[in-house]
Amino acid sequence: MNNAPHLYFAWQQLVEKSQLMLRLATEEQWDELIASEMAYVNAVQEIAHLTEEVEPSTTMQEQLRPMLHLILDNESKVKQLLQIRMDELAKLVGQSSVQKSVLSAYGDQGGFVLAPQDNLF
């Protein structure tokens, strides 16, 4: 059975999914990016299944190599963008924790509101 056309098509689909994920990450559409991840994983599994059945010829491997490089480049860029987002979220969580600690420590002062006042002298 010659699955070369099917394998090539599967790789093209993976490239499209990879480009979509990069676009979503670039546009900071994080929910959509996460939602698209399963389709990407399924496409990778489909390729793995196809290559288990029959190893691609040397010619086919040469044709697929540029696609693989593009996918790996896209994946690297997505990871960089995700790391930036994770750093932003960690900073926000840290700020929130500090704010919560301050409110917990100084928020309940026996019914008095602590606020700066003008000097009365």
Curated annotation (Swiss-Prot):
Subcellular location: Cytoplasm, Cytosol
Swiss-Prot/TrEMBL GO biological process terms: bacterial-type flagellum organization; negative regulation of bacterial-type flagellum assembly; protein folding
UniProt keyword annotations, A-Z: Bacterial flagellum biogenesis, Chaperone, Cytoplasm, Repressor, Transcription, Transcription regulation
InterPro entries: FliT (IPR008622)
Cellular component GO terms held in the UniProt record: cytosol
Keyword Metal-binding tagged: no
Transcription in keyword set: yes
Region described as FliD binding: 60-98
Pfam family, one: FliT
Main location: cytoplasm
Region of interest called Required for homodimerization, as start-end residue ranges on this chain: 1-50
The protein's role, per its UniProt record: Dual-function protein that regulates the transcription of class 2 flagellar operons and that also acts as an export chaperone for the filament-capping protein FliD. As a transcriptional regulator, acts as an anti-FlhDC factor; it directly binds FlhC, thus inhibiting the binding of the FlhC/FlhD complex to class 2 promoters, resulting in decreased expression of class 2 flagellar operons. As a chaperone, effects FliD transition to the membrane by preventing its premature polymerization, and by directing it to the export apparatus.
Subunit structure: Homodimer. Interacts with FliD and FlhC.
HAMAP family hit by this protein: FliT (MF_01180)
Family: Belongs to the FliT family.
Protein name: Flagellar protein FliT
